[in-house]
UniProtKB/Swiss-Prot annotation:
Reaction(s) the record says it catalyses: N(1)-(5-phospho-beta-D-ribosyl)glycinamide + formate + ATP = N(2)-formyl-N(1)-(5-phospho-beta-D-ribosyl)glycinamide + ADP + phosphate + H(+)
Protein name: Formate-dependent phosphoribosylglycinamide formyltransferase
Lineage, top ranks: Bacteria, Pseudomonadati, Pseudomonadota, Gammaproteobacteria, Thiotrichales
Residues bound to N(1)-(5-phospho-beta-D-ribosyl)glycinamide: 22-23, 82, 286, 356, 363-364
Subunit structure of this chain's protein: Homodimer.
Any one biological process term the GO annotation gives: 'de novo' IMP biosynthetic process
Amino acid sequence: MLQIGTTFSKTATKILLCGAGELGKEVAIEAQRLGLEVIALDRYENAPAMQVADRSYTLSMLDGEALRHIIEKEKPDYIVPEIEAIATDTLAKLEQEGFNIVPSAKATQLTMNREGIRRLAAEDLGIPTSPYAFADNKEDFTAAVDAIGIPCVVKPIMSSSGKGQSVIKSTADIDSAWHYAQEGGRAGKGKVIIEGFVDFDYEITLLTIRHKNGTSFCAPIGHIQEDGDYRQSWQPHPMSDIAVQSAEKIALKITEALGGWGLFGVELFIKDDQVIFSEVSPRPHDTGLVTLISQDLSEFALHLRAILGLPIPNITQHGPSASSVILPTGHSTETQFSGLEDALKEPDTQIRLFGKPEIAGRRRMGVALARDTSIEKAIEKAKASAMAVKVDF
């Protein structure tokens, strides 16, 4: 039976977030609602989740020694990775020593690295994926592009939010794609994945929750990506019963292999009734921000319930809903937002401003959420709400 102690006492139940961005912030808020003591880590000061945490630390989480020092000092009950760039070998050792890594050190290690998760899905589990190859030098990269064929997609094996990703549309793009991937990779030592182009009708995120009573699925989330990063999402995305069943079967298979309790964002391509696996994140997914308005339990609430071993008897859908990101371009440490009166004038609209302390170039600074009588109306309402928010630098 779960017992939650008193914060700032010897009985406190502590959750430590490795990553303090906007998704971590929502997890921290859900943890606060249940009386947990929240510690947030990130590589920069005043990150969004730090603003609602009880304590925070600034460090590179790729520094295993520094990460271990904080974890041994805090002795958290739950260690929850919220980003990919973490010293996963250190987490694996800490798990062996008795610390609780969410959902598991194995899941964190494999999904941090596109090579690990792709080999697990395609080679170990036999799940349909796009054609792929890996390369860690320019010569092998050029050969892999030739073998996979053009057009193809190039991604660093370790990156997020579209960093380093590009599409090779002709041989003239090969050099620039290689160099762009090298700039965008975090800790992958220059290695990239080359993926064959997939002919698909649409792509979805299937939020999959592994909890003490089994596995639950949220309604499919459709989304639009630009430059490898999410711009809009909506729920539910219409799918045939056959496609939904295939998607859930694949999601169940991959999440069972990763193990542990928590929410997973499983990304899938759909062509007619055929489902092709793309990626999986063992944590809340950015496209799942729409669940803040579309469901009675958001993806963040579901993640926390699963982590704590609490019941998830059902997930109630409120109706057609959408999200649209607020994505300004500028340079400032004193960003100001206006236009909220216009952004929120329609019923069933919400705004989340993430509280990021700095913008340097283009950065996701918030999201508009909307609900309506149809997906199309919800998307338009969310877009209009996001566009109404003005950003001054």
